[in-house]
Amino acid sequence: MLIIEYDGTNYHGWQYQKNAITVQEVLEKAIEKVTGEKVNLIGSSRTDTGVHALYQVANFKTKTKIPPEKLPYALNAVLPDDVVVVKAKEVDKSFHARYSARSKRYRYLILNRQFPMPTMRNYCWHVPYPLDVEAMKKAAFFFRGTHDFSAFKASGNKKVNPVKTIFDLTVEKEGDLIKIEVEADGFLYNMVRIIVGTLVYVGLGKIKAGEIPAIIESKDRTKAGITAPPQGLYLVRIVY
């Protein structure tokens, strides 16, 4: 099992794609270079283009004699600077980085001031209009619990179960930065970014906090807010 951090700016997400560079591909090539083995790396979360990870977990099968504690040093020597393996450890054969996870936690950063910040342009969503953070906090409360989150998913695989349990959803402001964190037993495609976009609409007064339960009940994507851009999103924790 590997614990990985990466800056997603220059990658077309986690999952392997034929004609685009991805984090999975870069890591698999590094593992092959170090161990001489072609592996299939399974990630806990298939992050999208531009999304970052402070705690991604991945597993693969290997016969390498390199001790797990030495593996991060070997891999980091051949990986690009924007992908780092911070830990490696041996796990049971039944372990699956994605399906063994009990919960995942994401963080989203919003820069809420008149002008953008050049050094943060790839790491947050710049919203130039003042946001009512207290209203956003009230709205966040209604997302907690077990619901059908069909109104908060992008069109895609309709066979995926839309019922998810959100254990925690917080909104905090520190200076010009608004930090939104959400933890759940699983997420639908773009669910976190649509929840963030909806909270921003609440902050702008376009949606009232008290309307959130009705939006959830509607199961209608058009009733929710916009999809927040990817660069403000970070995978921060996986619980097994």
Swiss-Prot record:
One of its GO terms (biological process) is tRNA pseudouridine synthesis. GO terms for molecular function: RNA binding; tRNA pseudouridine(38-40) synthase activity. SUPFAM superfamilies: Pseudouridine synthase. Its EC number is 5.4.99.12. The active site is at residue 48. Substrate binds at residue 106. This is tRNA pseudouridine synthase A. It comes from Caldanaerobacter subterraneus subsp. tengcongensis (strain DSM 15242 / JCM 11007 / NBRC 100824 / MB4) (Thermoanaerobacter tengcongensis). The lineage of its organism: Bacteria, Bacillati, Bacillota, Clostridia, Thermoanaerobacterales. The gene is truA.
